[in-house]
Amino acid sequence: MDKVLSFHQGRLPLLISMPHAGLRLSDAVRDGLVEEARSLPDTDWHIPQLYDFARDLGASVVAAEYSRFVIDLNRPDDDKPLYAGATTGLYPATLFEGEPLFKEGLAPSGEERKRYLEQIWRPYHGTLRRELDRLREQFGYALLWDAHSIRSHIPHLFDGKLPDFNLGTFNGASCDPVLAERLQGVCAEATGYSHVLNGRFKGGHITRHYGDPAKHIHAVQLELAQSTYMEETEPFTYREDLAQPTQVVLKQLLQALLAWGAERYQR
């Protein structure tokens, strides 16, 4: 499969991962989707555009090209569930609202899915591993920011309205607690926005697997409510008027992340 990811190598010890930004579909997935899924409603819409300042900041960036409807890059390759209750797996079978993703009998075959694992999932995770190792080798530490977004109202997954900024550190296991406090502080000072640490979204496979403070790799997931930068209904339009103030907070978060790293490791 061609062009399964995009990658930009930066100049600072920060890697931003965008595993759910992809829009491409395999033929088998496209042919099998129910009508409600054809607009790719569960995409982390416009995340590369929202973080377009990150390259100038000096971050490395890796982003998926294929949709999570093909394979979910934020799930382990053994498909072990990450959350209790309603969730989606390595090969999603349902939409976030709970309806079937594929028409009866038209889900991709086991052989097709094995191809997705080998040709999409493994290259993405290989890129993550190599870049984190390179950053740690060069700087003595590495910072991983797993960038996500989701609709603010999904009754099948969570009650009520999701906070705007949902920070996840796998209950403190994926990064230094002082770093988590710093990031919470940035969110608390952001007027007009709500936030939570380790609420409904505590960090998926990427945060849990790569975050290893004892080995000087600190990982944080941000699940951003899409209402902070776009229309949450079709055609899922990017709203510059909403996005600009949200980008200010995102930049402050990444700058706080980098400042903490430089202070902690005296670099």
UniProtKB/Swiss-Prot annotation:
Pathway: Amino-acid degradation; L-histidine degradation into L-glutamate; L-glutamate from N-formimidoyl-L-glutamate (deiminase route): step 2/2. Optimum pH is 7.5. Retains over 65% of its maximum activity between pH 6.6 and 8.5. It comes from the Bacteria. Induction: Induced by either urocanate or N-formyl-L-glutamate. Stimulated by Co(2+). Fe(2+) is also a good activator, particularly at lower concentrations, but it inhibits slightly the activity when used at concentrations over 0.1 mM. Other divalent metals tested (Cd(2+), Ca(2+), Mn(2+), Zn(2+), Ni(2+) and Mg(2+)) are not effective activators. Its EC number is 3.5.1.68. GO terms for biological process: L-histidine catabolic process to glutamate and formamide; L-histidine catabolic process to glutamate and formate. It catalyses: N-formyl-L-glutamate + H2O = formate + L-glutamate. Belongs to the N-formylglutamate deformylase family. It comes from Pseudomonas putida (Arthrobacter siderocapsulatus). Monomer. Keywords: Histidine metabolism, Hydrolase. InterPro entries: HutG_amidohyd, N-FG_amidohydro. Catalyzes the hydrolysis of N-formyl-L-glutamate to formate and L-glutamate. The gene is hutG. This is N-formylglutamate deformylase. GO terms for molecular function: hydrolase activity.
